[in-house]
């Protein structure tokens, strides 16, 4: 038996892993009081009966908090504004959720007078880092228990056997081959046939989005309104953060929007293969990018791409509660001052195509950009600009003797 703890707060989902962790903690840590904590960030029916299940498993109580509003407003929308995408593809749905869940878990632990925190993350994954960095930020003195790094359970079969031996009620079976994570932003799928990156995902695996081939044969247009980079309306109707994202999820899912297949580099050093569904998030990303094209000057837009890359790494690595993230957010907020307007998208069989954008403070001037001659832009001025801009190229050529045909 490990060192005794008196009270532990467990990050709890009600799935197979966290269900068996409850009796395992009691068995291996001196029969502590186990309090379960679950954040509602958009799992929908996965939350049904969760409190009763936790208590039946041996927990003394189970907190279930609706954090959807905070999640969308304070995590997803800043992520959207930053432009962060991990390794060109992943919209960071799982990564960005962990800091909020772990922070509230730590706060509950302090409120309850617990002396330990526990999570069900595997020793091979990124989530263990995300949870524990957050614990360090909010409850650095509490003991952290990570059963997957301690116990002898090595497979789904082992976990099901343990559940049966300890009378833990679970709905999981050996046929449930995929490891999934769901919230209001996305659904992820790993494991099963995806462990071979050559395998095409089975259509039956997808749970949020329609097969693009079976999507409507007529395109649908959607207009997203933004105020200083924050989405506020859909097709002219003003909506709160949660309702707006749920609306776009429904619209996007119908048209098969937001499916990606990615082999990614995990923080812990290995590569993993996952499939993600992010219908509403994909629509918002395309719309937001389109509006930034109008409202950001070239230097700011290009440098923001650099920031976006680092922001994505920061979120993926679990470094949300750091001075760097606060500093990057401050930069991003300045860039969003004029990102107010509308973007129009055409949704058709898996594609979200930007087909229109307008903004009150647009930097696009049709009088200057037009191919027709006007007094707004003297094309003769380009001659001097080219000479100055190209001077380093000319000097290098003269140095190497190119002007005389030398080689």
From Swiss-Prot:
Q: Name one GO biological process term.
A: urea cycle
Cite the PROSITE patterns for this sequence: ARGININOSUCCIN_SYN_1 (PS00564), ARGININOSUCCIN_SYN_2 (PS00565)
In this chain, ATP is annotated as bound at 11-19, 39, 120
Q: Which principal EC class is assigned to this enzyme?
A: ligase
The terms describing its cellular component in GO are: cytoplasm
Its recorded name reads: Argininosuccinate synthase
Q: Which organism is it from?
A: Roseiflexus sp. (strain RS-1)
Binding-site positions, L-aspartate: 122, 126-127
Reply yes or no: does the keyword DNA-binding apply.
Answer: no
Enzyme Commission number(s) of this protein: 6.3.4.5
Quaternary structure, per UniProt, is: Homotetramer.
| Biochemical pathway | Amino-acid biosynthesis; L-arginine biosynthesis; L-arginine from L-ornithine and carbamoyl phosphate: step 2/3
* UniProt keyword annotations, A-Z: Amino-acid biosynthesis, Arginine biosynthesis, ATP-binding, Cytoplasm, Ligase, Nucleotide-binding
- Quickly give the catalysed reaction: L-citrulline + L-aspartate + ATP = 2-(N(omega)-L-arginino)succinate + AMP + diphosphate + H(+)
The disulfide bridges present are: none
Supply the SUPFAM superfamilies for this chain.
Answer: Adenine nucleotide alpha hydrolases-like (SSF52402), Argininosuccinate synthetase, C-terminal domain (SSF69864)
